Curated annotation (Swiss-Prot):
GO-annotated molecular function: ATP binding; tRNA binding; tRNA-uridine 2-sulfurtransferase activity
Region (Interaction with target base in tRNA) location: 96-98
Protein name: tRNA-specific 2-thiouridylase MnmA 2
Species of provenance: Aliarcobacter butzleri (strain RM4018)
Gene it is expressed from: mnmA2
GO cellular component: cytoplasm
NCBIfam families per the UniProt record, alphabetical: PRK00143.1, trmU
Gene Ontology annotations of biological process type: tRNA wobble position uridine thiolation
Length: 367
């Protein structure tokens, strides 16, 4: 029944995309693997091991009996993801390149490439599900809540989702690895990739300062007193604890006379100052009201004022209850039942109705 349906699988050389290809092959689809080369190996600070990952993908393809091709999307990734990421950092924001990559590359230029290859659908190893809700294709919560990637996929349109498959949506990560081992896939025990692809194992600030100018400035305490110097605002994000480069201040020791850790509370781009506080739940780190702009609504309509929804302000955060205070096509304001820690400008606020993802936008204000 599926023999005439051609599926192009985005293969990364990891266990998730490999098992995705295997499952679809077993289901009788005409499967072709396509490895995306999104980053130029050797670009300043780059640590993306493209060649190794491509070889792993081809080994899996040979084992399960599918062709695996490679395609260069370096220019598109640079223009639509990396440059946008850098511009956001310059403005004092903390953009998420994975969200941009899914919207602009994997489910856009990759999808178009797959169509040119005669594909009926594309498939990836994301942990998510697709459902029909109010005549639209929407993201649904996967079986493995700990791996739920709908946060990264929230900017996809119903049209994009109509051409996509997520075969791992009904599996746990443990089950995926068990399937890989049972079929002797060479990547069955390969570690999951973490962090931002193009940064690799480097420290964030070491990589970023190769691409953006870091201008040192004053570090302030909550009262506005200068207590140190920062390396450049592009090197920090809200809630950050490590790498601030400031020890304890006399008079702020804890009961056992050890210095309390510092946390980044805010960045002032205009004055080039970094405000830090002590106490992981300091009031300056907590917010109940969050505004997001540049909204993408999967249902093509905003929720209503007063709607009770669930939301995430970062990946892997447990979904939090909130109430819609204001909403239109471009903007939404929600008030959380409980204060949220380290809400960050430029990150995404993603909203859910039950298990369905309604969409999201870039955080533009919080208090």
């Amino acid at each position: 029944m599926n023999k005439n349906k051609k599926i192009v699988v985005g293969m990364s050389g990891g266990v998730d995309s490999s098992v995705t290809a295997l499952l679809l092959k077993q289901q009788g689809y005409d499967v072709v693997g396509l490895f995306m080369r999104n980053w130029e190996y050797g670009i300043k600070g780059s640590q993306c091991p493209n060649r190794i990952e491509f070889e792993d993908a081809k080994k899996v393809g040979a084992l399960i009996g599918i062709e695996v091709r490679g395609k260069d999307f370096v220019k598109e990734y640079r223009d639509r993801v990396f440059d946008v990421f850098l511009e956001g950092l310059k403005q004092g924001l903390t953009p998420n390149p994975d969200i941009l990559c899914n919207k602009e590359i994997k489910f856009n230029v990759f999808l178009n490439e797959a169509k040119s290859m005669g594909a009926d659908m594309i498939a990836t190893g994301h942990y998510a599900k697709i459902a029909k809700y109010k005549d639209h294709f929407v993201l649904d919560t996967p079986k493995d809540n700990t791996k739920d990637q709908s946060y990264f996929l929230h900017a996809l349109s119903s049209e994009q989702l109509s051409h996509a498959m997520f075969p791992l949506g009904d599996l746990t990560k443990k089950e995926v690895r068990e399937i890989a081992r049972a079929h002797n896939l060479p990547v069955s025990d390969k570690k999951d990739s973490t962090g931002i692809c193009f940064i690799g194992n480097q420290k964030f600030d070491e990589f970023i300062t190769q691409h953006l100018q870091a201008i040192p400035g004053d570090i302030l305490d909550e009262n506005g007193k200068v207590i140190g110097k920062h390396k450049g605002l592009v090197c920090y994000t809200l809630g950050q604890r490590k790498g601030i480069g400031l020890g304890g201040i006399k008079g702020n020791e804890s009961e056992n006379n050890t210095h309390k850790p510092w946390f980044v509370a805010s960045k002032d781009v205009v004055n080039n100052t970094l405000t830090i506080v002590q106490d992981t739940n300091h009031p300056l780190l907590m917010s109940k009201t969050v505004e997001a702009s540049h909204m993408h609504w999967v249902l093509e309509e905003a929720p209503k004022v007063g709607d009770k929804l669930m939301a995430q302000v970062r990946y892997r955060q447990q979904k939090q209850a909130c109430t819609v205070v204001e909403a239109n096509e471009e903007k939404v304001v929600v008030e959380f039942d409980n204060p949220q820690r380290a809400v960050t400008l430029g990150q995404s606020l993603v909203l859910y109705s039950g298990d369905y993802c309604l969409g999201g936008g870039f955080i533009s204000f919080y208090k």
